[in-house]
Regions:
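N-terminal hydrophobic or amphipathic helices/low-complexity stretches enriched
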Residues: 31-109, 156-157
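N-terminal secretory signal peptides and thylakoid transit peptides that target proteins
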Residues: 1-15
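Extracytoplasmic/secreted proteins, especially bacterial periplasmic and envelope-associated proteins
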Residues: 64-67, 71, 85-97, 116, ...
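Metal-dependent peptidase/peptidase-like ectodomains
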Residues: 218-317
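His/Asp/Glu-rich mid-to-C-terminal helical/loop segments that flank catalytic regions of hydrolases
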Residues: 316-349
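A non-catalytic alpha/beta surface segment that caps or lines the substrate-entry region
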Residues: 80-155
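Second-shell loop/turn segments in exported
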Residues: 53-58, 76-85, 140-142, 179-188, ...
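Alpha-helical metal-binding/catalytic segments enriched in His/Glu/Asp
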Residues: 167-173, 177-223, 340
Length: 349
């Protein structure tokens, strides 16, 4: 999680058309490492309609958040730094999961007027530095060439296709620095696995929601929430129809039933999470962010009810090479997923 508000302002002028996307389409075809492919079964793209529950592959429905964390922290993904081949491989994994679950692509429009899963933008170069023992990024030379990056977005379409609730998590991390791999298991493969689990559960139930449930995997969060900022500035579906955003970040560590919430007010998203947490006998406190932030921030600035759910002890081992799979508590991921599932239910059914 970045700490510098100046960095956010520096990135505010980004656009998706600055750098051609020569590498992404071909790389995405072969991006999933063989070691990860061994645990999944690729399916063809499955189209959905507004009148049906997504058609899906049971293999994908049976996966778990821990499976997702294992895949995303694989060494071949090189820490998932935005603008790298590792990020592309992570995006390919997420697209494969969305296709397998039968989610409708909700990214950028293509030439045939259909949507892609990818939502493109570019990032400025950055310089690495340590801040109180945590590896962070600060802005590099803004005159240097920008690098392509992408959010990954898909949805379980509801009976009212003009209204949506977003479940989001950033999938990027810090990459490799000075020969050290930063796997980012808790930050934020845990959040990615958590919201995928919620979507699997919703689809398994086979009940079409009243509102769309959108999965949005943001990239370049570690560089200043660039992916979510880009989406807020140029959404790929109706901005006025976004009822709430439930963002999940670093949710898998610390005491089992203790969570924190970040938001700019006691909005409907906050209230839904607090109510759902009470049903699970968990503690979720709306807390000051103390200079830190996450991807709810630009939605809040744009007057969209949005909240970030995170572990109370999220800073422990954050942005260090020790943020590995063994650091994540599967029981806490399960609890967080159930809280989010109940919160989403309150707004989409």
């Amino acid at each position: 999680m970045p700490t510098r508000r100046g960095f956010i302002k520096c990135l505010a002028g980004i656009g998706a058309g600055v750098l051609p996307w020569y590498g992404w389409p071909e790389l995405l075809k072969n991006a999933i490492p063989q070691a990860v492919q061994a645990s999944i079964q690729t399916s063809n793209s499955i189209k959905t309609t507004v009148n049906s529950v997504p058609q899906n592959d049971q293999t994908y429905l049976n996966r778990t958040a821990i499976d997702d964390i294992l895949a995303l922290t694989h060494s071949e993904l090189q820490g998932r730094r935005a603008g790298t081949v590792g990020e592309e491989k992570a995006a390919a994994y997420l697209i494969d999961q969305m296709r397998g679950l039968g989610l409708e692509p909700l990214g950028d429009l293509m030439d045939n007027n259909n949507h892609n899963y990818l939502n493109a933008f570019t990032v400025y170069p950055v310089v690495e530095e340590f801040y109180y023992g945590r590896l962070t990024f600060r802005p590099g030379n803004p005159d240097d060439l920008r690098t392509p990056s992408a959010n990954v977005i898909g949805g379980f379409m509801g009976t009212n296709p003009n209204e949506s609730v977003i479940l989001s998590a950033h999938y990027d991390h810090l990459g490799i620095f000075h020969g050290n791999l930063y796997p980012g298991a808790n930050d934020n493969a845990s959040g990615v696995g958590c919201i995928l689990d919620v979507m699997r559960r919703l689809i398994k139930e086979g009940v079409k929601p009243n509102r769309n449930v959108v999965l949005a995997f943001w990239s370049a969060e570690e560089m200043g929430f660039v992916g979510s900022y880009s989406f807020v500035q140029k959404p790929t579906f109706s901005r006025t129809g976004i009822e709430a955003v439930f963002n999940v970040d670093t949710v898998g560590n610390g005491p089992l039933e203790e969570f924190a919430l970040w938001a700019n007010s006691d909005n409907k998203a906050v209230q839904a999470v607090q109510s759902a947490a009470a049903e699970n006998k968990a503690s979720v406190a709306l807390t000051p962010n103390n200079g830190y932030n996450s991807d709810q921030v630009y939605f809040n600035m744009d007057h969209v009810p949005a909240v970030t759910l995170m572990a109370w002890d999220w800073l422990n081992k954050n942005h260090t090479p020790e943020d590995v799979l063994d650091f994540v508590n599967p029981q806490k991921i399960t609890l967080a997923s159930d809280i989010l599932y109940r919160a989403v239910q309150k707004l989409v059914f």
